Amino acid sequence: MSLFCWDIETTGFNPKKELVTVAACYTPHRQTVYQFAESDLRGNVVKIHDFIEKREAFLTELDDAPILAAFNGTGFDIPFIATAFEVDPTRVMRWMMKSFDIFEAAKRATGRTFSLNTLIGLNGFNTAKTGSGADAVLQAKAGKWKELASYCAEDARLTYEISTRKRLALPEGYAWRKKHNDRDHDPNKVLFMLVGSSYQIEFEIGTLPAASVIPGLLPNPNMSHLGSPHEVLWEDPTPERQHYFKDLPQ
């Protein structure tokens, strides 16, 4: 069962006032970009003429996907489209329940936030993002729709590349240093794994050489009963580690 990776670009951060401009969907076998906005004669960003048809086609893809994966999808992308596209709450909840959010998992692991570009650099990828969300806003205002679509599509692809790594290097988080700075520990030791409905991914604290990154997010059918895609379990569930996990920033 493959991940369905996706990303959106917007004209700002307030879904009640701003627009979704483009959305990209990526699987190993198919890539789709939806454009929801265009420039009018005065250069203003407005909804495209067939907005409703494209919106429903995109939302249906989210409905049909077995597992959704977006970088900060549960924190930004899903809430934004839920409001901007006026989506039924039950439909939104189904998306949340089947979402695998590598950003949220990394934040729990380190107690900090960082960009997709940071993860790409730490894990030895030969590619990098060519812009940021702020750049995407400027591209829309400048009417650079082709460039914006390409940028969004690349984000969705990179999210797939990051999300399908068996081992993922993360920058060491403040929460771990504060909790364990008085004892020796291996910076490359596997600390915990994130268990999803069909997958598990092991996170390592500390920067790993590229050779240590093992591709392939392996199916783990024996753990499908453990709960939602965001449930985190210790590989070595000692009382000390269980207590530490409770103190992690949410």
Per-range role (PLM):
Residues 1-250:
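DEDD superfamily 3′-5′ metal-dependent exonuclease/proofreading module
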